[in-house]
Amino acid sequence: MEFDFFSFVAPSRVQSLVLPFGRVRRKSFSSYLQLLRRVSHIQLSDVPVATATRKSSSFNPLAFPLGRLVYNFLTSLDDQQALLEEFEYFRRVFVLIGIVDGSEEQEVEQLCSTLDVWRRRIPHALVAKCIVFNCPEDKENIFNAPNIIIGPRSDFSINSVMRSILCDITAELLEGFSSLEFSIHARSVILSPITDMPHLAPLQRKNSNASIHSLGSSSRPTLTRTPSITSRSVNSVTERSKSLSKGRIENQFGQLYLLAGRVPNALKHFSTAIALSKATGDFLWQGLSLELFTVCLVIMAHLHVDVQIPPNILSMFPSYNDRLNAFGPLKFDALLNFITEMRNVVDQLYQKSTLQPNDAVPGLCFSESILRYAHLLTVVYSCKGFNDNALDHIIAQAPIRPVKKATTYVPNKATICQWIMRAQGQHLNSLSIRERCRIYGAMANMLGSIGFSRLRVKMLRELVASLTPVLLETRRQNASKNGIHPEVIASHTAQSFKSTHYCNILPLISEICQEYGLLKTDGSLLNPELTKWGWSNLQFDVLNELISLCDSLSDYRSILLLISLFFLTSVQTASSSQQISMFKAFRKTYLFASNAGIHINAPYWDPFMITDLKFIGSSENAELIHQRLRNGLPKSIEKGPFIYNPFNRRQDQNQSKSVLVVDEQVAFSIYFRNPLSVSVEVQDVHLETKGVSAKCSHSTFTMRPLSIERTTLTVTPTETGELHIVGCRVKVFGCEPILQYVYEAKDKHKSLHVYLEKSKDVNAELRSLDTIDHLWTYFPFKKDLKTKSFDCIVIASQPKLSLAFQNLTSGKFNFAEYETGELVYVIENTSFVEASHISVLFEDSSSKAFEQAIADKSITADRLYELQFEEFNLPTFTVESSQPFSLSPGERREIHIKIRAKPNSQEGLILFESSVHKPEDTEFYVRRLRIPVSLNISKRVDLKQWSAFMDTEGDPSYCLVLLNFYNHFSEPLFVTVKTASTDESRSVLIKPKADNVILFRLKRFIMSSEEINLDIPNLSTKQFVLSSGFKKSIEDSYTMKKRFWIKEYFLKEVQASWKTDDNLHHGEIYLRNHILSDEMANNLSILPIRIQAWVSYDSEKVTTVCPREPFKLVLEFFGHADTNMRYKISWTQLNTQANTSSFNGLILDGPEEDIVCFNNSKCHVVIERNMFAYTTGMYNIFVRIFNEELQLLSQPVDLDEPILLIVDAK
């Protein structure tokens, strides 16, 4: 590999230009060049000395056999370095080598001619040779020329032969150095570099004399300030130049010996040059000599040769006198500190040289000198000390071995950074673009080595800013020469890149983008929401700079990538104007590339383009399809420790999948977001599916700025199985088609997170073009986000029903409350599959009212029964036959549906369920045809009041019932009341907005106490928590149950209906909403046992008896009972209002209580009891009968009215 030009020991390397001569393939030339670079270090002990000692022994290699001559093989020539060759010899090309491929057909005369041309172009080259590689033996005699050398073949020891060839070249080079030494010695005047050239502008004077302290030394040498030489005559300048030439000649001798590997001789000459230059005030050459002296010290340290510092140099650094003059091993720490002190002096000398206009240091030389020393510090920092590892890398550019712990002094990063940044200045603006880019590149490389990635990228931005206008100007000049527009040149340049790999600038672009938070190699992005200090503006400026660079190179693909990257990372913080300008550039670049025949696309910038995906079913609104799975047999449940496990249920719910039908189209609603302030054109979008094959529709639309757009896409499965909708394949204008997933909303914020740490060891990765190209092909982001997919099960073709006819037009149907009617529908099987099972189901809004009513916490048991009765026994819709039927393809069937208009059933739904399955199938699918029905319900006739009275004819078995009806309608209505037991009907005409009464006799209901004590039934099979009102009604006693059961008997016996005069409308009158009072309940019912009693005297009924005369109390019991009953007699004297006993008032012959025996055949029992009165007065006699066994739970029966008995002596 080529040596680093900014290495600290770069002045000790001989520049050798290697060129291909004749017909040489690129790959062969690279391999031959690699062979030369393998043996670039030539030991002086291996160089033959006969030729070198012919004239002089000054460059005899055996004088210092430990020395090495190092070649730096170049493949290009920099003509701008020629003006500095006399100042720094390491810039001069001393060796010219032409590589010839012996396996190709070559012409020797042409090779020699080419070599002569290059010798004339490089007149200072001391050696010019052609090396023929891989030459067959039979062709060796062809290349018989003095300047042509036969190189190694594949069957030879390649390294040995190459080293032998270079040793011969080195011997000839040393002979040339001897001649050059004599010519230098013969010179009378040696001038400093000409700084009048624009690219060799002198260093500008700085006000600060900052220097870096060495470790352990607080003293710094003080240099005497010399006034600037502003004006001198020609003669005086000439005399001064002559006086300065002695020191400069010694400096050039030292440079030659340094290049020749004779380091001790170079140290001697540099020491002399320092002394002479110091005496004459030649600051430029004194600084150069002192700088090269430090290079010699580093080389000697690598050779482990002790060095004795000359006294004139030690006098400049008194603190190092004892440490550096002692004999023994060289101390690395002391040497590094000493070099640091010398480097400070060199820097001051170069600064002082700016006061001498004719001898000022060129800005290029100063920056390179600074960077060479900074490179030394960087290597020491990387090797954790100035040790053998660091020296091997500095001298031979060997790989740096890992070191766990620092054993010597390691300069800190801040110190190294200060030295690197001192190479920057205004003088760089006057350098040529090549030298300027080389300076900025070296600074960026060193800053990256110490971990200052932000400053490294800053230098890369300076490099881009310097390179872009030069490239644009070059394009303009080429277009001006050819007389065409510069855009045509750009188009031709871009077209020439179509078939080649043109991503060479991507590593540079990628690194800059990474450092400014636009892209990271690990896939993370910088979240700009947490960087509020103008970060987005900085990113915008950086991208503009990179886009300008790509534009100057006609790299349209990189322009599109950069703009897409800007939209990806800065969309949340970029201003509207920035977004609009970027999108205009994106559109212009894409259209220009397309017109030029270059088809390139950038990755789309928004990975979360889809915000939601919803299933909306069939695209035909008239036929809403609902598919569900019916399980014929219950699935077995695994035994577990829990009675109910909610997690299992949640898992089952999550595993539920929608069901699709083969060859039936379904639609999805997809919501796309556009976070930009510009309109984005979606050229194509369709659903992305996995699993079974399906046909997907395509769509195109435009997303408005800062909006969420909704579009509908359809999919038609073509076979049975599982179908997964994973997202959408979207093609945006100028972008690659990308699969957009649907992500969980809670995980989207994880895709962007703050990444402000410094990058570590990314340079090696960035050098790989494959890595960079893959990185820019798809924008990376967090891959651990959860995606959502719509999973479906595709089943075989299913029957499809449609409504062919209905007897009423669409709209609301007008009905009165509880009016009955009939709806006629004709359904047709429009599919090619037979519907083997078709059933009719109904839904209406009264169910919601029922659920709301039963949710009342104060609802009682009887009210709950009324609601359940209306919900379950009085459905809104009924069908004549509830048995399933079948329809063949194309067949029609007429369905008659009866309707009962309940008050809360304004909205209804008729469902025709169709399916195809065999009787033995346990699982099948059904499809519902939904027909909505809207009812407009109004009041017609309702019961305003009801009452029951005792029969006026005195028959206790009958009562009178009064029903008061009110007509809400605008026409007269006929109301009919019918009794079920007698089948009698009573009708009355009720005028509009008026009421009328119907009065009729009704036989009273006989109810036993057991029937009354029955619990109020619950018609619902569902289990629910009893409300407080329901519990209270259950615990309530006899009254509520008696009222409930009597009402039930009454509603079974009495029905009321209404009809119009034309008999077109009719309906029933709902009577359950009215409450039955206790009085009405008693009048409507009679108990199963009745008591009649009277007083008998001489077999006649009397009400008055005489005292002390016996009379009879006759008790007559009617009814039946399954068990024995017990009666009780009691009386009360009215004048005293106190109960009496058998000892005062009245006397009973026996006990007051006795048993009455009933059986099925004995329904009438008469009992006579003898009594007499011995006290006059008025008495009320009471009789009560009750159950003998269950007295506490039985309801006693009393005499209807107490017997009034008058005892009077008269």
Curated annotation (Swiss-Prot):
Where composition is biased (Low complexity), the residues are 214-233
TM regions (residue ranges): none
The question of whether Cell cycle is a record keyword is answered with no
Protein's UniProt keywords contain Zinc: no
**A GO biological process held by the record:** intracellular protein transport
Mind listing the UniProt keywords for this protein, alphabetically?
Answer: Golgi apparatus, Transport
Q: Where is this region: Disordered?
A: 211-243
Q: Which Pfam families match?
A: TRAPPC9-Trs120 (PF08626)
Which locations, inside or outside the cell, does it occupy? Golgi apparatus, cis-Golgi network
Coiled-coil residue spans: none
Which positions carry the signal peptide feature in this UniProt record? none
Gene Ontology cellular-component annotations: cell division site; cis-Golgi network; cleavage furrow; growing cell tip; trans-Golgi network; TRAPPII protein complex
Self-association or partners: how does it assemble? Answer: Part of the multisubunit TRAPP (transport protein particle) II complex.
Which family does this protein fall into? Belongs to the TRS120 family.
Q: What does this protein do?
A: Component of the TRAPP II complex. TRAPP II seems to play a role in intra-Golgi transport.
Q: What is the name of the protein in this document?
A: Transport protein particle subunit trs120
Q: Which organism is it from?
A: Schizosaccharomyces pombe (strain 972 / ATCC 24843)
**Which taxonomic lineage does the organism of this UniProt entry have?**
Eukaryota, Fungi, Dikarya, Ascomycota, Taphrinomycotina
Q: Which gene encodes it?
A: trs120
